[in-house]
């Protein structure tokens, strides 16, 4: 069985590496020649724990990397994992998935194979049926789900945990008609993941499942952040104890109840916005979803309000941001709350210094020379008026009274509450903790 994977980003490269490491014959396709060359040499374009190690195992076994779609001609299975980024209006950009499906169609026109095409890219309901299938049929001059199969197969990977999630998914979702291709798809996934629950449904349902999943996670985060704001205004209230207590209720669960600066990354903000736009487009009131999104945006404003309260004017004040990645163990800054904070601080004419063990290069691509970048914590804190801990990198746990001596104002805003209980010798504010 030969497997083709189109799009070697976070999802596609993780999938290609894991399957190849398990001795499946895998061809990874990406139109970026430079990226392909790096991957061929065992270098990952993104920082993800265990990805490079798994990639190199896969390359030693059967993984082939190419930028030529013609390599898909002999594939039995094709996974489409290209990006669907957010447009300025909040809708998703489908140009890459259109290009990928068009190329697949042209390739299978010349092939004697009857492949199954799995759409793993996150797309709004109706995309497979109204866009993907017509393009494939037009370009291949063949009939979908007769001459080749098309199945919606959303992914649920977490950044910083992608390899584990690829190996051990919590569920397999397969959307499409009950054909011989669906029967074969079930058998394939039963072989790869024999103990994982499988849900077989329609195209549109499989597509909305991904949005339902991510919007619910975003809702939990905004909910705990709203409670965090309340706790912060109650003397001695502790949001972590609140989260721990309600998380013990099996109807709620403990995951995604860590209060902080808000949700970010490549999925939750994009998918929440896309779902709101989709709901509006079909005439459904999305007031609740909009409230979740509004609460998320307000978190950064709350941090700036606290900063202004303690510093007065922040114009020309040195503000240190610790962590620009949207979460630890990644270099991804897409929709990072740190980036949002920096942009707003720059509008207030603050002088920004940033530190991050993995994401500085990506941060430079956004801000260039507008802010200062440092690789040592000492340089980050030196003469700083205020330090804001945004990302929970383990090395920030080491901050103490001695660390802060070189600061000018010794004001610490800890959005992750990692320094609670430490004697810092300055003014310390932990988000979600009442004073």
Model-predicted segments: where are they?
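Structural/interface elements that position substrates and couple domains in central-metabolism enzymes
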Residues: 1-435
């Amino acid at each position: 069985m030969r497997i083709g994977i189109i799009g070697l980003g976070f999802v596609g490269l993780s999938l290609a590496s894991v399957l190849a490491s398990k001795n499946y014959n895998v061809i990874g396709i990406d139109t970026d020649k430079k990226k392909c060359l790096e991957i061929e040499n065992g270098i990952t374009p993104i920082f993800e724990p265990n990805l490079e190690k798994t990639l190199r195992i896969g390359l030693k076994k059967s993984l082939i990397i190419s930028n030529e779609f013609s390599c898909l001609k002999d594939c039995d299975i094709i996974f489409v994992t290209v990006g669907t980024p957010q447009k300025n209006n909040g809708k998703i950009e489908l140009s890459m998935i259109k290009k990928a499906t068009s190329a697949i169609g042209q390739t299978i026109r010349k092939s004697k194979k009857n492949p199954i095409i799995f759409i793993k890219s996150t797309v709004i309901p109706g995309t497979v049926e109204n866009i993907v299938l017509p393009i494939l049929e037009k370009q291949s001059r063949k009939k979908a789900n007769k001459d080749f199969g098309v199945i919606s197969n959303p992914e649920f990977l977490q950044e910083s945990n992608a390899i584990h999630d690829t190996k051990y998914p919590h569920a397999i979702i397969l959307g499409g008609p009950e054909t011989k291709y669906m029967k074969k798809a079930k058998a394939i996934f039963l072989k790869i993941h024999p103990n994982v629950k499988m849900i077989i449904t329609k195209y549109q349902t499989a597509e909305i499942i991904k949005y339902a999943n991510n919007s619910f996670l975003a809702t939990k985060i905004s909910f705990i952040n709203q409670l965090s704001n309340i706790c912060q205004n109650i003397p001695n209230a502790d949001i972590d104890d609140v989260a721990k207590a309600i998380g013990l209720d099996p109807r709620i669960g403990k995951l995604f109840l860590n209060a902080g600066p808000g949700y970010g990354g490549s999925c939750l903000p994009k998918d929440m916005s896309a779902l709101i736009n989709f709901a509006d487009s079909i005439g459904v009131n999305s007031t609740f979803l909009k409230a979740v999104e509004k609460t998320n945006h307000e978190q950064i404003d709350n941090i700036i309000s606290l900063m202004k309260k303690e510093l007065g004017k922040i114009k020309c004040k040195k503000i240190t941001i610790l962590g620009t990645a949207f979460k630890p163990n990644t270099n991804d800054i897409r929709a990072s709350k740190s980036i949002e904070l920096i942009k707003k601080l720059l509008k207030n004419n603050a002088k920004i210094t940033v530190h991050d063990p993995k994401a500085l290069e990506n941060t430079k691509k956004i801000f260039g020379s507008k802010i200062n970048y440092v690789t040592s914590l000492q340089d980050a804190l030196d003469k700083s008026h205020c330090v804001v801990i945004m990302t929970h990198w383990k090395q920030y746990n080491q901050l103490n009274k001695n660390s802060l001596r070189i600061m000018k104002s010794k004001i610490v805003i800890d959005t992750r509450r990692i320094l609670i209980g430490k004697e810092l010798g300055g003014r310390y504010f932990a988000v979600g903790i009442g004073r």
